[in-house]
């Protein structure tokens, strides 16, 4: 299962010159081209829709609707946070922010503000809140400030980084109202977040713009709640940062460029593809060619982007495959395993004739190498192989299973292999898919626990890999587009 989305930031819509207008028009056409490659699941808009606090007129909404239409989405799949240019500034708000920042503990003072003072800060975003309700069709949760969206394939934590945004040079000092932020993030289901779902946080400002101690708290929360990606804008120049060796669960910070062309901004946006089955993530940066007026991949962002793409692995998702393969190493009851095989044959009432070709087996080491199988799978295969004799004993005798049903197990597993092997990039994923599919079909009619049923199916699948003509494809020769 895959997830695909775009991040567009710093539209600054009221800023318009010739290059910017042409670039924005071409962007809509280019997004349609990208969509023809593969469908999008959602859109992230990470702030600065307006320019210098200007009004959100019908032209703004029309352009955003054009992006959404080009992506083939509805507004239910759009996630939008404010930027510092979406703020209206006034003297009262500025004086309040100054008093907070000059206090001995600004973060604590912000958390303890009374409602009247909080309202002064929040009112700076009133135009944005009104636009959000008008455009999105739902109210912005201004009292919560930060909020959570959850779905089957992905979760989005929207962080409002602009509560104290007020002046130039504030990067590295911004506060988020951490009590409110923690209240939002703790709504995430930790157990669900550990599963096959992409966990994203978005904000306008990069983490480097947040005050240092609060930034470390945010990173700790990301660690605790399995956040995989943080996406931001603000700096008008794309970048990426991996928090490797910092957290138990590293996350990738992606920063998009802007959708304006001036002497300061890099016109750029980001496309992200994530394979939820193995954590393989592909980030593509698209940049505007001002001279020849077209969008293309940007391969100038460092050595890892030489091909115009950043390849990254979400280890949390990758490890789920290993967990699916793993089970306890307890010895199984061979008599019960025999009963399972017999029961399985009885369950498979209809079947086609299948003949395995034992003369054309290729070496296991070559199978595992060509199929890009991991060490965990190879180790479990070795442990399961001690039960192959039990299976062969049943298959060699008509005392357990009638001769006309001898090939049912092999046929079932081979059919599943043929159905799924082209959908996955390595043997581990194919193995897990085969086991899960057979389990879903038969577990309700077999009198064994879930754990035992899955373990027995794993053993039978490994036996079939050894005895039958499956796992002979070469995944190393397949190039991923």
UniProtKB/Swiss-Prot annotation:
One of its GO terms (molecular function) is DNA exonuclease activity. GO terms for biological process: DNA repair. Pfam families: Metallophos. Disulfide bonds: none annotated. Belongs to the metallophosphoesterase superfamily. This is Uncharacterized metallophosphoesterase-like protein YydB. The lineage of its organism: Bacteria, Bacillati, Bacillota, Bacilli, Bacillales.
């Amino acid at each position: 299962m895959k997830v695909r989305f775009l991040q567009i930031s710093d539209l600054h819509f009221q800023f318009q010159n010739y290059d910017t207008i042409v670039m924005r028009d071409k962007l809509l056409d280019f997004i349609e081209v990208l969509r023809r490659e593969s469908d999008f699941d959602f859109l992230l808009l990470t702030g600065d829709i307006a320019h210098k606090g200007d009004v959100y007129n019908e032209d703004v909404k029309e352009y955003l609707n054009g992006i959404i239409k080009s992506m083939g989405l509805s507004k239910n799949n759009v996630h939008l946070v404010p930027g510092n240019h979406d703020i209206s500034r006034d003297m009262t708000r500025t004086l309040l922010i100054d008093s907070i920042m000059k206090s001995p503990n600004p973060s604590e003072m912000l958390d303890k503000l009374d409602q009247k003072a909080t309202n002064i800060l929040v009112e700076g975003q009133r135009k944005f809140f009104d636009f959000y309700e008008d455009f999105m069709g739902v109210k912005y949760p201004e009292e919560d400030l930060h909020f959570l969206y959850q779905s089957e394939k992905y979760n989005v934590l929207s962080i409002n980084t602009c509560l104290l945004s007020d002046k130039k040079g504030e990067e590295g000092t911004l506060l988020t109202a951490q009590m409110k932020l923690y209240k939002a993030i703790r709504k995430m289901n930790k157990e669900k977040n550990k599963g096959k779902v992409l966990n994203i946080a978005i904000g306008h400002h990069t983490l480097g713009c947040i005050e240092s101690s609060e930034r470390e708290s945010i990173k700790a929360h990301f660690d605790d709640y399995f956040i995989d990606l943080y996406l931001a804008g603000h700096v008008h120049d794309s970048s990426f940062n991996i928090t490797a060796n910092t957290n138990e669960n590293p996350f990738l910070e992606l920063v998009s460029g802007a959708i304006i062309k001036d002497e300061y901004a890099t016109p750029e946006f980001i496309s992200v593809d994530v394979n939820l089955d193995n954590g393989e993530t592909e980030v593509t940066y698209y940049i505007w060619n001002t001279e020849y007026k077209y969008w293309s991949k940007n391969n100038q962002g460092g050595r890892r982007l030489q091909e115009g793409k950043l390849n990254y692995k979400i280890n949390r998702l990758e490890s789920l495959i290993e967990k699916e393969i793993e089970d306890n190493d307890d010895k199984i009851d061979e008599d019960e395993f025999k009963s399972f095989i017999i029961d399985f044959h009885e369950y498979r009432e209809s079947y086609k004739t299948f003949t395995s070709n034992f003369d054309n087996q290729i070496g296991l080491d070559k199978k595992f190498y060509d199929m890009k199988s991991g060490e965990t799978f190879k180790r479990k295969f070795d442990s399961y192989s001690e039960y192959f004799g039990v299976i062969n004993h049943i298959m060699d005798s008509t005392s357990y299973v009638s001769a006309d049903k001898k090939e049912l197990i092999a046929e079932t597993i081979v059919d599943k292999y043929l159905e799924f092997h082209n959908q996955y990039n390595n043997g581990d994923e194919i193995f897990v898919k085969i086991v899960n599919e057979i389990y879903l079909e038969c577990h309700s009619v077999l009198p064994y626990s879930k754990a035992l049923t899955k373990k027995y199916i794993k053993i039978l699948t490994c036996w079939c890999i050894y005895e039958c003509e499956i796992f002979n494809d070469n995944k190393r020769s397949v190039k991923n587009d």
